[in-house]
Amino acid sequence: MSQQRVFDSLTSLFSTHPVVFWHDVDAEFATVVDGLQLGGVQLVRLDDTPALRVKLDIERKPDQRWLIYSAKPEPEPTKDWLLDVRMRSKLFRADSSSILLEDLGLTTQGLRQHLKERGKFLRARDRVDRLKRLVLPGDTAADLDRKMLAVLTRADQPELFAMLQRLYAAMVVDGVANLSVEPKAWQDIAANELTPAFWELSQVQLGYADANPTLRDLLLRILVTDFCRGLQGDAPQQLAHFVLPDRTLAAIASVFVGRWRADIAQYGNYNALARAVAKELDLVNLLSGQSAENLVECMTFEDVELRVVQDLKKRIVAGAGANMDVVRSLMARRRDGHWANPLLASANERTRALVACYDALTAAADFFMLKATHTAGFSFANADTAFSQYRDELFRFDQLYRHFHTAADAVEPTGWAVLHELRDTIEGVYSGWFIPQLSIAWAKVMEGPQGLLTHWKLPEVTPQQAFYERKVLPLLDGGVKRVFVLISDAFRFEVAQELVQHTNSKSRFKASLDAMMGVLPSYTALGMAALLPHKTMAYKESTNLDVLVDGHLVATLEQRNEHLKAFGGIGVKAEDLMALGKDKGRELVRDHRLIYIYHDRIDMIGDKQVSETKTFEAAAQSVQELSSVLGFIINSLNGSAVLVTADHGFMYQESALDGSDKSTLDDKPGGTLKAKKRYLLGRDLGTSSKAWSGNTAVTADTTLDGSLDFWVPKGASRFHFAGGARFVHGSAMPQEIVVPVITVRETEAEEAKTKYVNISLLGAVNKVVTNTQRFEFIQTDAVTERMLARSVVVSLRDFSDGDKPISDEPSITFDSTSQLLDERKRSIFLTVLGGAHDPHKRYDLVMRDAVSKVEVLRLPIKVDLAFGNDF
C-alpha cells in the first residue's frame, strides 16, 4: 500500500473513531509512520511506551485523536492492558493481505494468510480485478482458489467443468487434438502455484486422484467413465481401471460430458478430443463384440456410432424384413444422440455422413419390410387393380430405393465401406427381384385382347391427354380466377408423393395427389403436348416427328405460348418466373387465367450419359425447387390453385446394365422413323413377340391420319445402351406411365394448419430420489402430414435459482406415425448433478423444443437424493 493510500485510509477512519490501532507486524511502514502528518492526531509507538501510560493519556485527553502504532501482533485479550480502549476503537491494517481482503470484499480475517500464499497470482492487477467480479463476502480458501483457477483459464463460470472446457479446447488446433500439449492456461496455473488446488478440486468434484495426475489422464478417465455408464453390461477389462471410482461423482462426470457435447460452441473441440481418446484406447477393437443394444445409450465416442451402424446393417441384411421394429427403435435413439443427430447435420462432413447412414438404414429396413409383405411376388386381377396398387403402395419400392441410394451416396466421400454390402443387397433385390417380378405381373395386364395396349383406358383414371379438360377446366369453371399448371419433366409419381408430404407440412398449403394414365410412348414431346388444352393431337409429317396440337407446333416454349393465347394463357420457364420477383411476376400473370410453368431438372440430368448417375440427386433437388415455386405462386403471385404434373416418369437403376437388360430384338423393323432406348416410332411396324406394340391413336388419342405405330421393350429392358442406359423412359412400366397430378390450394381452414405433436409425462413421477432417474413420455398424437414430429431437450431445473439446470440435458424425438399408444412411448434417463438439493425447494422437469427452445412441458418435482441414498 502506498503512503498516500495509508494517509487516506487513516484519515477516513479518524472521521468516525478517535482511537485507531495499527499493528504493522512486518514493520513495513515503521520508517514512514512519523511522516504521515495526520492533522490533530497524536502518534503513540506502543512498543516504546508503557501501556498503562498510554491508557492514562487517552483518559486525560478525551478530545484528542490517537494513532497507536505497534510492530507486534495484537496481544491476547487477557494480556491486553488496553482492551477497554481497543473495544471502542478501530483497527487499521496496512499489510497487502489485509488490503486485498478489503479490496475483494471478504469478511473472513482468517484468509489473510491464504492470500499471502497466493501472492504470485495477486501480484497482477488485471487478475485481481477479474477475481473481484467473482468473489462473494463469505468465500472460503477453496472458493478463492477455484475462482483464481477460473480467472487463469478464462472460464465463463468459476466451475471445474467450465475450466476443463477451456483447458481442453486449447489442446485442439484446426480441428485436430493433441493430448500431449500443455495449454498456456495450464502453465499459468503452475506458475501461480495453483496446480495442487486444481487437483484437489478434481478429487472433490470428480473423485479423480492419481500419484501423477495429468490433464490427459483426467480426460481419459472422464470420457471412459461416461462411456461405461452408458454401456449395458460390464465394461471391457482394458477400460475398467479408467472408470472414476465414486458412482455419484461418476454420474456428475457424465453430466459434464453431456453438456460439453451439447454446447454448440464446444462441439468441434469435443469431437476432436473424443476421437483422439478413442484412437489412444484402440476403441474400435474393444467394440467389435458389442451389440447395438449394449451401445444404444453410449454417446461418448464416434466409434460407437460406427459400430452401431455396422451391427444394424448386418441385421437388416440378414433379417430380410423381419424384426425391423427393434432396428427402427435403436436407430431412433441414436438419432437423438450426439454423433448422428440431424439437428447437428450441418456441423461437419462426418456428422452429415452418420446422419446419412441412418437415413440409408431406415430406407433399407422399410424396403425389406415392404418386400416381406410381397414374398410371393405380384399378381393383379386386372389393369385397374395393377394401376391402383402401384399408385397406392408399390411406388414405395422405387421411393425407398431412391432414398437409400441418395443417403448411401452421401456417405461415400468419407471412404467408409460400412454400407457397401447393404448397397449390393438392395440392388440385388430391386433389380433382381422387384423389377422382374413387377414386369412379369405388369405384362399380364398389358397383353391380350383385354390388355391395356388394346384399350389404354381405365374407368377411374384420367388419361393424360384429358388433363386440361378434367383437371384444369373444372377449376376455371368453378370460379377460380387463375390456374397455375407446373409441369416438371420426368417428375415420376413417387417423387411427387414426397413433394405432397413436404407441401402439407406447411401451414396454409393443402396438397392432394392423384395419378393419370400417361400417354404411350412415354416421352417428352408427346407428354408435353397431351397436357396442353386441345381438341386434337397428331404427328406432323416430318423427320422430327413433331406433335401438332390443334394443328399447331408446340415443341418450344414460344410455340406453346402462342397456342395458350387462345385459352387466355401463357407459358414460362420456372427459373424465369422466379427471377422476376413479386412485382414483375404479378405483372406477367395479371392478364392471364392460365399459366403453364415448365421445370426441368430430373430429365435434364438423367437423360445425359455424363450425368445420369446424379438422377436421384436431381429428384431431391426437384422437390426443393418445386416447393419454392409453389411458395412463390401462392405467397407472391396470389395463386389459389396450382396443379403439378409431369410429361412422363422414368426408370433408373444404380448398377451398370449388362446384356440381360437389353431387349433380344435383333434389329429395328422396317418403317421405323425414330429409335430410342425405350421406344420405336414408325409406320406399319407390325408386331413382335419381343416387344409391346401399339398405335398412338389408342394410347394418346392422336387422330387416325396423324397417328404412328410404336414398339416399346417389355419390362425394364432397353433396345440399346447408346448414350447412357440407367435412366430411361418411353415404355409402359408404371414408373413411366403413372403420371402424378398434385392439386395445391391455399386455405385458412383449421385442418390445413400444421402443428407439432403433443407430449405428456406418463405416471406420477413427482420425486427424484436417485442420481439417475427414468422418465417415460407419450406422444399423444400420431405424426401425419399436418401433425409434425418434434425433437425436444429434457432437463431438471432449479426454479428459484434462475432455472439453472441441475441435470444433464438429453434430446429425444417424438416422430411415431403409429395409431397405437404403446408404440408412441419414449423414455429417457436424467442424471442429477451432485450437491445439496433442498427437498423443500421447487425444482421442475422441463422440456424445450430442440430448435426453437420454446418450452413444451414444465412439471414441478422434488429432488431428495438423501432419501434415496438411505436405501
Per-range role (PLM):
Residues M1-V483, R492-V642, A646-F871:
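…; additionally, a secondary subgroup of soluble metalloenzymes is captured
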Residues L486:
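Short alpha-helical catalytic segment bearing the HExxH-like zincin motif
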Residues D489:
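Ligand-binding pocket scaffold of soluble enzyme catalytic domains
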